[in-house]
Amino acid sequence: MRALRIALWALALGGIGLACAPAQAQSPHTHMHSFSGAEHWARVFDDPERDAWQKPHQVIETLALGPDAAVADIGSGTGYFSVRLAHFLPKGRVYGVDVEPDMVKYLADRARREGLRNLISVNGAPDDARLPHKVDLVLMVDTNHHIERREAYFRKLAQSLNPGARVAIIDFNAQSETGPPPAERVAPARVVEEMAAAGFRLLGEHHFLPRQYFLTFQLKGAG
């Protein structure tokens, strides 16, 4: 899940990373790449040019978080959203969750360097975020389509949500010229169906991201 997302970010940023990617690392069974050089990939993920289409500040403002909110950024990588959220929520807590150990270590080191005591790096599993505490919001950016058993994943994730918590899913839309192959993308309507099967209802849909859809969910009966 996480390794493939790295390759997609390289595509989304104009192929910067793919030119340097070790082709021998690809698995014919998983179609994944191994990208252990977090320092290198930080330059790709955190390229300032990404801001123009990812619109991180507008995304965070749209989430309408309380000042002491607890947030999980699942698929956090080198901290593109996690670090911004930690700065935005000095009285809150942010869990950056990733399944790649090198990314987990990189984010933990980055949090220490930047003095972000409210940012905790978590080593998740492909089928479990392994959150240490319950949260008010889960943010997943270009991660949902990598999860193999999404209904089971979100049913388990529901156990880590505070009452009234929300799940925000941002992923590549069908029109985007960058991102995963069309066959691997998950259409918004399918996301809504799968989330409903996992016990969630659609709260809202936002349309300001040029390459991605942006959906928010809440457990049925909550709110």
What are these regions (language model features)?
Residues 129-138:
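A short acidic, Gly/Pro-enriched loop at the edge of an enzyme's catalytic core
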Residues 51-69:
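Conserved alpha-helix/loop element of class I SAM-dependent methyltransferases that forms part
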Residues 100-101:
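Conserved SAM/SAH-binding beta-strand->alpha-helix loop
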Residues 151-166:
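A short glycine-rich, Lys/Arg-flanked "PGG" loop and its adjoining helix->strand segment in the class I
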Residues 68-77, 166-192:
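Conserved class I S-adenosyl-L-methionine
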Residues 114-127:
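Conserved SAM-binding strand-loop segment of SAM-dependent methyltransferases
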